[in-house]
Amino acid sequence: MQSQTNPNPSLPDDLILSCVARVSRLYYPALSLVSKSFRSLIASPELYKTRSLLDRTESCLYILYCTSNTWHEGPRLRVKLMSCTACVLDEKIYVSGRCKDGDSMTFQVFDTNTQTWDPLSVPCSETKHDFHYKIVRFDGKLHLVSYKGVDAYNSKEGRWDLVTPSIEHNKYLYDCYRNIGNVWYTIVKGDISTSVWWYHSEEREWRDLKGMVGLPKFPIDACLRMVDYGGKMAVLWDDYLPGRRKKMIWCAEIALERRGSLEIWGKVEWFAHVLTVPRQYEFVKVLAATL
């Protein structure tokens, strides 16, 4: 009697990993439904390390249609970017980033109505050595930050205007920003102390957030993130444990009170260590969720 052969012999894990790494990330949600092993593979860091080694990294735009609750891949950027920053203004997505050659930057605009990308000229020509590519949206305009100053983009007139010269714009260069109650806040780390600032839109200047008694000094290399927590300010930051093999995530909750038109006070209600993670983790974004 002839023995029956297995019609679906298993493939080596390394071969499966190599094959999946060559597939667009758009199809990963579907692949994760195939089996538990595929689901584990899609979630594994080894997959993304392999994609990087094979030069299969992607700069993709995924669009969620809320009516059908489905994801679709949008048109790709016309240039490959090493890193980027983005924001939304007037139903358009503005993306600024460093090109893959590492020596130039680009500005691209995605029109959500026409589903197309278009280049946008920038008011500076800095290279990777002196350009801090950050875009921030407030006062109804797009603000482009460079070491030479801050330029605001008027989308209706298609014009850039210098709003802050380089000597006055240091508050824009920090990564921790959040709009809380229609007011922009940022945190400035220093060797001696940490300060929180808010932007007075009418006076067009940054002002010190008063109070803040009990706010701990953040490590100079800490990654900071801020979020609107029901009208209060929640600040999260990290700090290494001894040995630097793990990090502690800390959180502080700060109540905000406006006193007149020129002062805002902050009261630190509590802060505590809330989580321990491996040192390899990175803060990406902080969201306040209501369950």
Curated annotation (Swiss-Prot):
**Kelch repeat boundaries?**
46-91, 92-140, 142-187, 189-232
| Pfam families associated with the record | F-box, Kelch_FKB95
SUPFAM superfamilies, from UniProt? F-box domain, Kelch motif
Q: Which InterPro entries match?
A: F-box-like_dom_sf, F-box/kelch-repeat_ARATH, F-box_dom, Kelch-typ_b-propeller
CDD domains attached to this UniProt entry: F-box_AtAFR-like
Q: Give start-end ranges for the coiled-coil region(s).
A: none
Where is the F-box domain positioned along the sequence?
5-51
Keywords, A to Z, come to: Kelch repeat, Repeat
The name of this protein is F-box/kelch-repeat protein At5g38670
Q: Which organism is it from?
A: Arabidopsis thaliana
Origin organism lineage = Eukaryota, Viridiplantae, Streptophyta, Embryophyta, Tracheophyta
